[in-house]
């Protein structure tokens, strides 16, 4: 390994260390709570070193949004994609999302729920990045439902966009109430609601949705 390669590798490790902390801070306190000085102090790094990695507070925020999206994909989207297209994949996607929130992958619950509340009325690159993440997620839920309909496991007259909206609303409400009240009852209610909506849309070709305990 050359000296340059070693510096690049160390820089990448430091960047991941910093981003591991920024997603935690932002999920609880918001993206505006991120500062180079705070991160340098908490992680025992030099301010100049942290600044060199990101260049500005805005780039630090954008990198944090990208890292949160990467983690979300790894924990929710990718595992759900391992289930064959159909009602089972729709159910698994929702289950994984609820577990991602309930298990506090990010200590403040769903990272993007908080980021949307923080940046919904603002303008600029960070707002736009949060919007893209939200649209990508909604589109993925719709696509998963559409695949189930194409596979013959959901009724042909299923309003895909409406069903996706309702499932996302149930998941996000469970997240919000759980974080606010520090309890998990809302997750069961969300699972009951999701199961009911998916069963209502399913055809006889679909595997049965498990009963919610």
Where are these regions (language model features)?
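Alpha-helical DNA-contacting segments of helix-turn-helix folds
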Residues: 54, 59-68
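All-alpha amphipathic helical-bundle segments outside canonical DNA-binding/catalytic cores
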Residues: 88, 128-133, 150-166, 185, ...
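Hydrophobic alpha-helical segments that form the core
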Residues: 108, 113, 140, 156-177, ...
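Amphipathic alpha-helical segments used for helix-helix packing
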Residues: 89, 104-125
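Hydrophobic alpha-helical connector segments
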Residues: 63, 77-108, 160-167, 209
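C-terminal peripheral helix-coil segments that are non-catalytic and often amphipathic
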Residues: 1-5, 92-99, 135-151, 170, ...
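Basic, helix-initiating cap at the start of DNA-binding domains
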Residues: 1-29, 33-42, 59-62
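Short hydrophobic/aromatic patch on the recognition helix
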Residues: 43-54
